[in-house]
Curated annotation (Swiss-Prot):
Organism from which the protein derives: Staphylococcus aureus (strain bovine RF122 / ET3-1)
Record NCBIfam families: EIIB_glc (TIGR00826), PTBA (TIGR00830), PTS-II-BC-glcB (TIGR02002)
Domain PTS EIIA type-1 intervals: 560-664
Domain PTS EIIC type-1: 3-427
Top-level taxon of the source organism: Bacteria
Membrane-related topology note: Multi-pass membrane protein
Descriptive protein name: PTS system glucoside-specific EIICBA component
Amino acid sequence: MFKKLFGQLQRIGKALMLPVAILPAAGILLAFGNAMHNEQLVEIAPWLKNDIIVMISSVMEASGQVVFDNLPLLFAVGTALGLAGGDGVAALAALVGYLIMNATMGKVLHITIDDIFSYAKGAKELSQAAKEPAHALVLGIPTLQTGVFGGIIMGALAAWCYNKFYNITLPPFLGFFAGKRFVPIVTSVVAIATGVVLSFAWPPIQDGLNSLSNFLLNKNLTLTTFIFGIIERSLIPFGLHHIFYSPFWFEFGSYTNHAGELVRGDQRIWMAQLRDGVPFTAGAFTTGKYPFMMFGLPAAAFAIYKNARPERKKVVGGLMLSAGLTAFLTGITEPLEFSFLFVAPVLYGIHVLLAGTSFLVMHLLGVKIGMTFSGGFIDYILYGLLNWDRSHALLVIPVGIVYAIVYYFLFDFAIRKFKLKTPGREDEETEIRNSSVAKLPFDVLDAMGGKENIKHLDACITRLRVEVVDKSKVDVAGIKALGASGVLEVGNNMQAIFGPKSDQIKHDMAKIMSGEITKPSETTVTEEMSDEPVHVEALGTTDIYAPGVGQIIPLSEVPDQVFAGKMMGDGVGFIPEKGEIVAPFDGTVKTIFPTKHAIGLESGSGVEVLIHIGIDTVKLNGEGFESLINVDEKVTQGQPLMKVNLAYLKAHAPSIVTPMIITNLENKELVIEDVQDADPGKLIMTVK
């Protein structure tokens, strides 16, 4: 039961990132619009009083605010899109369902606009009236206040309707309404039923949420911030942190703005107070990120670099510099956190506790800084320094310096004391268990506890996914010794990151379990092991050119933790602008994934490159891809390898960003050129 629940929570957490991703743009508009008529700034720059500038700032501020005012609707649409694989029909169904659900609740409970607004003493217009917290006016519909929870509920139901009925067949005379056209219709019926149920079920839930928020925010907010910081960081590896922080950011707490409207949620309240120009009382559940993201984690990265073996310092230095800089500037910490999460969990435990204290210290000091993207330097400028007099943002700097010192010395001590295998301190290559290509799936199956211990077997281009019967029978250390760069365990679900070999290992394991292939003889193993150095002893320099027309981005910006964390190797991200992927060098095609979304190439000097077209494109089952080459075919630099329907990928995949990584960089140096605009003739990387 837990395993199924975890899987569903992962999907929901990922779906919530779609509406959350809109908030940085809205927050920037709101922050800059508000800053342009900030009294202190206007005194310094009187030209901001110009009528045109005032109009522009007002438009920017209003444009940002309208997004925060309609978050429930955005969560409904975004959740449906995320859970239905990005299909627009599910989004339309969620929109229709959300409106119908709110209209139903309003009619069942006989809610009118007079029940929502009651004229306050001296109020002359509706906008000055006090608002009834239990009710809301949603897009002109008087209804029950369900907040973002209502949007998430309706979005999830719309996605369920889509997944259940998108391919339904109807009698010929109703054929027009068959398939996807049926989804909004059935969602409307479900929305009516949901509205009726929520009319009676939501008020006690609402009372419970209000009581919980009052307890957390009023009884002991100091302790609450500490616990919040610990749990939020603890859930990062499982991708469930989005679910955890959403109630705190979008529901808990309340504030009545200058227009008399009730605003709920720590993040939304902070934005409303920014617009009203009042002292900040919100921000307790965002401010704590700044010290450890901007200062603590980069210092931890330096400690990891310092403790790397001398011959590995150059490689580890590049990895830690890029990951630390990413954390400082943007607040994206996963590339750095995942570099030590698997190999040194004790360091992640230290990090989690320090993150909790960061939230605690910021609250005790009265620092209140909002956030939309993450707690990096960019958000710090927009929401902290531009409002330093109200946010007390300058205190982040001395606190951050203290956290940098603490992080550095604790990580340095723990790495040396416990002999942790952080990047650059891994066991020597000779200590890794030898396993030939033919024998590897047998060894992995044995490490997983044997075929009797396998409940479900799956894989993608980056990782082997196995659900086991008894986790105690799994030899995690053995799996890593066989070449997995990391093993993620959640309940009985194991994810072993073998890179491009994962799918082949899965197919071979399936054949072994069915009896189609048997274990190779010792003679076979010996022969294959003696052949392995052919691939390891790469000589010379390999120039790697762009795989097409587009943009080159750092690998740390690729929206996938396995690639961004460099678990499969180093390289770059490529954003294609034309639907043709070409060979980056002269070499041989070693692998074409069955679903055509990934290609493995080998240069004449033995450098192996993986081109993974888009993110999560394995789920497209080959749709949108046309392979122009075959395995073992010799190719020349610039030769077309794959035709890609970019429009289809943009509509059906999370991202078209294409990681291009070197998978056998051991004992080699990678030089990445300072290139942004790319075409097939432009050099982007060199392996020496």
